[in-house]
């Protein structure tokens, strides 16, 4: 499509954060265009595992992730569309003495942050999840752990944004020039003037920031995921994570299981090329089957890798850029799917002159200019 000559706000990046930011702006009656270098909802948000859990998140960020789950529930209601959101709780498992000690310590830390957990071992664990391997010696259950369908979520957000009057366009950002009243953006689809720019480019945040003369270091991850054929429901719609990390597992309502957790593939974000590392893929599958043996009976349909990124301090980068009126950043640093709707609402509010929520203060992009 042809870009308009000018608009109030341009959101760069059509993932979970960019689209929710734009949706809130459009529903508030603001002019907004979302641009992306490729088809919308193609990269990180589209190729992740759909996990919206608390138990596998960093303790110091738990308050923000808890609010992220609140926003997911609001999103379900506000979209009035099927996004495959399931909230049946989740298990974080331990398989060794070291795991169990870490699980107890982690549960204590999370409980101190207000997360409600139930400790399970012995018969209580077998009764709750008979499908877990006998090597799983203990688990904590969190009723807030959830998941959603990345495919359905993206489709619903794009539909809702367009219905609200927003625009989504394939247009890669290639440069910018500051103006008295905003910015002139150069893109692969032409030039567009705007008052506000929201950078919601995920793994490409460092590249976009550099166009504005800002250095935001980003560590690229190339996460491996797999999906099985549809099999009979046996996991009670729970999310499973592992105290040792690099493990997420869930069974969607259609019966297919999604295996994730962060085993690494290979890729280069500038060329866009990415590929599976077969050793890492096999390690991921063995790990999953060691926790849930029934997975061995399912055929693997497809495996893939997707880009995600982490800031050098493993903190979100969210809010207005000091000294640069009209420039905002919305970078979640890992687990963006979980916290995305919260960040989107917060950044949209900031664009409209509202203060950033207390839970996100301290994560502004100004810390990189210090």
Predicted regions and their residues:
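N-terminal Rossmann-like FAD-binding beta1-loop-alpha1 element of flavoenzymes
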Residues: 7-33
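Glycine-rich FAD pyrophosphate-binding loop
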Residues: 26-46
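Central helical "cap/lid" subdomain
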Residues: 42, 191-236
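Dinucleotide-binding Rossmann-like beta1-alpha1 core, especially the glycine-rich loop
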Residues: 49-128, 246-248, 287-288
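Helix-loop-beta segment of a Rossmann-like dinucleotide-binding subdomain
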Residues: 83-92, 118-122, 126-164, 265-270, ...
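Helical element adjacent to the flavin cofactor pocket in flavoenzyme catalytic cores
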Residues: 140-195
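Active-site lid/adjacent beta-loop-alpha segment flanking the redox-cofactor pocket in flavoenzymes
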Residues: 230-326
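C-terminal catalytic lobe of FAD-dependent flavoproteins
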Residues: 290-370
């Amino acid at each position: 499509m042809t870009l308009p000559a000018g608009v109030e706000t341009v959101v760069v990046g059509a993932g979970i954060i960019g689209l929710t930011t734009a949706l809130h702006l459009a529903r508030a009656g603001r002019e907004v265009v979302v641009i992306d270098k490729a088809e919308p909802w193609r990269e990180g948000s589209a190729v992740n595992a759909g996990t919206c859990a608390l138990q596998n998140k960093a303790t110091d960020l738990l308050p923000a992730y808890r609010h992220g789950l609140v926003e997911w529930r609001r999103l379900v209601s506000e979209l009035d569309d099927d996004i495959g959101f399931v909230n049946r709780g989740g298990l974080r498992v331990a398989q060794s003495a070291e795991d169990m000690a870490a699980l107890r310590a982690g549960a204590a830390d999370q409980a101190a942050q207000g997360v409600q957990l139930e400790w399970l071992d012995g018969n209580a664990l077998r009764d709750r999840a008979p499908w877990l391997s006998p090597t799983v010696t203990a688990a904590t259950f969190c009723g807030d752990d959830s998941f959603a369908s990345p495919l359905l979520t993206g489709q619903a957000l794009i539909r809702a944004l367009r219905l609200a009057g927003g625009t989504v366009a394939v247009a890669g950002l290639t440069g910018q020039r500051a103006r008295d009243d905003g910015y002139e953006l150069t893109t692969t689809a032409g030039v567009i003037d705007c008052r506000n720019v929201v950078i919601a480019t995920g793994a490409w945040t460092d590249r976009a920031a550099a166009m504005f003369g800002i250095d935001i270091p980003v560590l690229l991850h190339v996460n491996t995921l797999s999906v099985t054929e549809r099999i009979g429901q046996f996991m009670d719609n729970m999310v499973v994570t592992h105290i040792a990390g690099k493990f997420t597992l869930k069974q969607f309502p259609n019966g297919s299981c999604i295996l994730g957790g962060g085993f690494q593939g290979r890729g280069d974000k500038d060329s866009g090329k990415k590929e599976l590392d077969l050793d890492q893929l096999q390690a991921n599958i063995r790990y999953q089957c060691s926790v849930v043996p029934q997975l061995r009976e399912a055929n693997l349909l497809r495996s893939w890798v997707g880009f995600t990124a982490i800031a050098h301090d493993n903190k979100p980068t969210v809010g207005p850029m000091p000294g640069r009126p009209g420039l905002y950043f919305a970078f979640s640093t890992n687990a963006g799917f979980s916290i995305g709707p919260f960040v989107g609402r917060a950044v949209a509010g900031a664009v409209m002159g509202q203060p950033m929520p207390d839970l996100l203060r301290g994560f502004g992009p100004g810390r990189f200019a210090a």
